Structure formats: C-alpha cells, structure tokens
Curated annotation (Swiss-Prot):
It comes from Salmonella typhimurium (strain LT2 / SGSC1412 / ATCC 700720). Belongs to the globin family. Two-domain flavohemoproteins subfamily. The keyword Iron applies. Induction: By nitric oxide. Monomer. This is Flavohemoprotein. The keyword Metal-binding applies.
C-alpha cells in the first residue's frame, strides 16, 4: 500500500502530466528504444509510428495518477492490458526496464526533484506488481489447460482462403500434432513473425473466428495500406509455412446464458470476433434471439456473408441486417445488402428492445461510438454494451 504522502505527491503532478500530454510518452519510448533496442522485437512499431501506442500509454499513466488511491477502479484496465501483455510474453524483469525509463523521463522533462521521483518510483512499483501477479496467473491458466502451453508454440498454416478483396482467413495447426487450448469466443491469438526482410520480430493479435474445436485455430486478416504484417500474410505467407503462436487471450468475450438475447454489431473486419460468437451460439443451439448487424463499404469487401447466413439458418431466432455504405451496381442487382448508407439501428428497434439483451461491438472506433450512441438513445444500458478495439484501447 502507498502512504498518504506518496499519493499526494503523485496526484500533485497530474496538472503537469495533462499539460505535457503524449509528448511525455514520446520521450519515454524514444529513450527506452535507444537504451534497450531489443524491446523493438516486442513492441508493435507501427503503433509507435502512428502515435497510437504513445497516446494509449499517456492515458494509462494519467488514469493511474488520478485513481492512485482507488486501485479497484483501474482493475478493468489492468485486466485488458495484462491479457495483451501475455500475448507479447512480457516478463517481470521488463517492468524494471520500463520503470527505469519512466523515472528518467520524468526527471529529464520536468526535473521535479527527488521527492517526486521517489513517490513515482513507489507508485510504479505497486502498479508493476499488480500486473506481474495477474500476468503470472494468466500464464499459469494458459499452460494448465488441455492443449495449453507456455511461451510460444510452433504451428503451420494449413489453409489460406480469400474471403473478400481485403480479408483473407488463415488456419493453423500445431507442428507437434497435439491438441490446442480452448478459448472464449471473442478472444484473440498472438501471432509471432520475423520473415526475411523484416527489421524486427513482429507480434500481432488477431481475433479467433470460430468456435474452439481442439484441433487448430482460424483467424482472418485485413490487408491494411502500409501494413507490414498484413501485407506479408496476404502476399507471401503460404500453406505449409511455420508461425509461432502465443496462447489465446483477451478480456473481450461472450459469456451469456442460453436464454439471454444477443446482438452482434460490427463493421468491416470488426466482424472477426463476432464470427466466433455466432459460431458458438449456433453450435450450442442458443434459444434466445440472436441479431447479426453488419456494415461494409460494398460487396467486394464484405467477407463471410455465406458463412453467416449458414450459421443463422441453424438458430431458432435469428435476425440479420447488412448495410452497404456505397453499394455497387452488382450489389444492387444481386440484392446482397438490406440497407444503403450508414448503420441505422432505429429501424430495428423491435429486435433490440429486450432489456436483457447483451450487445457486442467491434469495428473502427468511430463506428463503435456511432453505434453505441444509437443504442443508448434507444434505451440500452451502458452495462449491456461490450466492445473491442483493434490496436491500443480507446474509450467510446
């Protein structure tokens, strides 16, 4: 526990942190990668270049300082970050490196004096121990499962299937021929790659896209403009190639009773965790209402449409609605969509009126903000809305 003086000293630095903003974390990362370049093998350098990770770390530091005397308020954020850390195989000793550079950054940018640095050192130590303890639990849980493992495990690609102009699915099976650990629908897989020509090892998290079967895993990857890993997977990865995988993880998952109605709301590649949820609901013959609401640019980039239809037909109470923002003439001729333009949930108010319904959202942050605002305006409780951000977390 932190003493009152330490808490007061840390909280007194909040105005300085807010005034400095993400420049603080930019300095921190630049310093850390200069002194410990081996960490470039772990961090997503694309998120470093676009600033997303720097903004996310700043928000986390500011949130910790603001809630330092109320750590339970931070536990949801701790769980989200700890789950992601296990996908990167973060180790306790790496927290010492981060702590060293965080304190050095505070000293170099603000010269706040030893009392402030000591207070932040104590505060960081408490938070680091919370993460280390929770991550140790997750590592143990993953290794103890049937088909589970520690660290990373070699797999090979056994299927590569284009699903749209931008999305391709990949299926993996373990090289050792053993079983693989189950996961909760909505969780992701840690994919570790360092192909020829990559400056650093790259680690990405991709949502699992079907119900666990104990034999292997399936993900689906959108080819991003300028995306190093997604373009390599689309253009160079082949059936038979090897990859290393970290065990499934993530704090976003579906956990509902058979009589709980569910709405799965997505845009673009945000449908990937929803596919695992829908597959699970279908395989378990979910008896309550299931809604599948999806938005895409047009039919060229709309993936898994046939699979969703097939799964939906097996459910006793299923409603699907698809929006195309800019449908092609072919889309119109084939009637591949239900509505044109942006997703408008007010048209389907009757399908989402049950107060017990749980809503799962995934897609671009702007889309999720747009959809969540509509749901709240239609009377949905915020507690019933669950969402996943691809990349560093953002608050809707």
């Amino acid at each position: 526990m932190l003493d009152a003086q330490t808490i007061a000293t840390v909280k007194a630095t909040i105005p300085l942190l807010v005034e400095t903003g993400p420049k603080l974390t930019a300095h921190f990362y630049d310093r850390m990668f200069t002194h410990n370049p081996e960490l470039k093998e772990i961090f997503n350098m694309s998120n470093q270049r676009n600033g997303d990770q720097r903004e996310a770390l700043f928000n986390a530091i500011a949130a910790y300082a603001s809630n330092i005397e109320n750590l339970p308020a931070l536990l949801p954020a701790v769980e989200k970050i700890a789950q992601k850390h296990t996908s990167f195989q973060i180790k306790p000793e790496q927290y010492n490196i981060v702590g060293t550079h965080l304190l050095a950054t505070l000293d170099e940018m603000f010269n706040p004096g030893q009392e402030v640095l000591d207070a932040w050192g104590k505060a960081y130590g408490v938070l680091a121990n919370v993460f280390i303890h929770r991550e140790a639990e997750i590592y143990h849980e993953n290794a103890s499962k049937d088909g589970g493992w520690e660290g990373t495990r070699p797999f090979r690609i056994v299927a590569k299937t284009p699903r749209s102009a931008l999305i391709t699915s990949f299926e993996f099976e373990p090289v050792d021929g053993g079983t693989v650990a189950e996961y909760r629908p909505g969780q992701y897989l840690g994919v570790w790659l360092k192909p020829e020509g990559f400056a650093h090892q790259e680690i990405r998290q991709y949502s699992l896209t079907r119900k666990p079967d104990g034999k292997g895993y399936r993900i689906a990857v959108k080819r991003e403009d300028g995306g190093q890993v997604s373009n390599w997977l689309h253009h160079h990865a082949s059936v038979g190639d090897g990859v290393h995988l970290a065990a499934p993880a993530g704090d976003f998952f579906m956990n509902v009773a058979a009589d709980t109605p569910v709405s799965l709301i997505s845009a673009g590649v945000g449908q990937t965790p929803m596919l695992a949820m829908l597959d699970t609901l279908a395989k378990e013959q979910h008896t309550a209402q299931v809604n599948w609401f999806h938005a895409a640019e047009n039919g060229d980039v709309h993936a898994f449409a046939d699979e969703v239809s097939e799964l939906g037909r097996t459910l006793p109470r299923f409603t699907a609605h698809t929006w195309y923002r800019e449908p092609t003439e072919s889309d119109r001729a084939q009637r591949l969509f239900d509505s044109e333009g942006l997703m408008d949930l007010s048209k389907l108010e009757a399908a989402i009126s049950d107060p017990a319904m749980q809503f799962y959202l995934c897609g671009p942050v702007g889309f999720m903000q747009f959809a969540a605002k509509q749901l709240v305006s239609l009377g949905v409780n915020n507690e019933n809305i669950h969402y996943e951000c691809f990349g560093p977390h953002k608050v809707l």
